[in-house]
Each structure stands twice: as C-alpha cells, then as structure tokens.
Swiss-Prot record:
MF terms (GO), sorted A to Z: rRNA binding; structural constituent of ribosome
GO cellular component terms, semicolon-separated: ribonucleoprotein complex; ribosome
Protein family per UniProt: Belongs to the universal ribosomal protein uL23 family.
Identification of the protein by name: Large ribosomal subunit protein uL23
Any one of the GO BP annotations: translation
GN (gene name): rplW
Subunit and interaction comment: Part of the 50S ribosomal subunit. Contacts protein L29, and trigger factor when it is bound to the ribosome.
Organism per entry: Lactobacillus gasseri (strain ATCC 33323 / DSM 20243 / BCRC 14619 / CIP 102991 / JCM 1131 / KCTC 3163 / NCIMB 11718 / NCTC 13722 / AM63)
Keywords: Ribonucleoprotein, Ribosomal protein, RNA-binding, rRNA-binding
Keyword Ribosomal protein part of the UniProt annotation: yes
Described purpose of this protein according to its UniProt entry: One of the early assembly proteins it binds 23S rRNA. One of the proteins that surrounds the polypeptide exit tunnel on the outside of the ribosome. Forms the main docking site for trigger factor binding to the ribosome.
Amino acid sequence: MDARDIILRPVVTEKSMNLMDDKKYTFDVLVSATKTQVRNAVEEIFDVKVKNVNIMNVRGKEKRVGRYTGKTARRRKAIVTLTEDSNDIKIFNDNKEN
C-alpha cells in the first residue's frame, strides 16, 4: 500500500495546532492502518524521524435532517511525535501574495 493512501489529511484544530509546538502532529489515517504503517508513511512522505505514534478511533456521530437520522463516517486519528533532531513538518504554505 502506498504511503499517501495511509495518511488521509492533517487534522487542523486549535488543540492540534498547540501540539505542533511540541513536535506532535495529528493526522486522519486509514481506518485499517496500524502504528507501524503510520510511522513508515510519515517518515517516507515528510522525510522526518518519528519517535512515537498514538492512535485513536473516533466513532461517527448521529446526525438528523428533519425526521431522518444517519451517522457520520467513523475515522481514525494518529498523533505522531517527532524526534528532537527532526525538522518540522510544513503543513501550510508560507507563500504570501502582495
């Protein structure tokens, strides 16, 4: 499986942005992905060294539209901690157009 198939998208919330100061990056990953697969994918895509990987499963929430109920999709989040000597991961472009 390709590394870009495992890492779906970065999670951009206030909490995850604060964790970036401690070299912890949060990603939505494939529901069937393991810690080892996430570690190898992050190291391959971003060219960094991973110290630790924590994974959590997020259940889908029930949503209603009128009288019809449904559920949002379940997902899996991975918090990846980088080593101290690793470079930071650039999630956002720093290009500013004037």
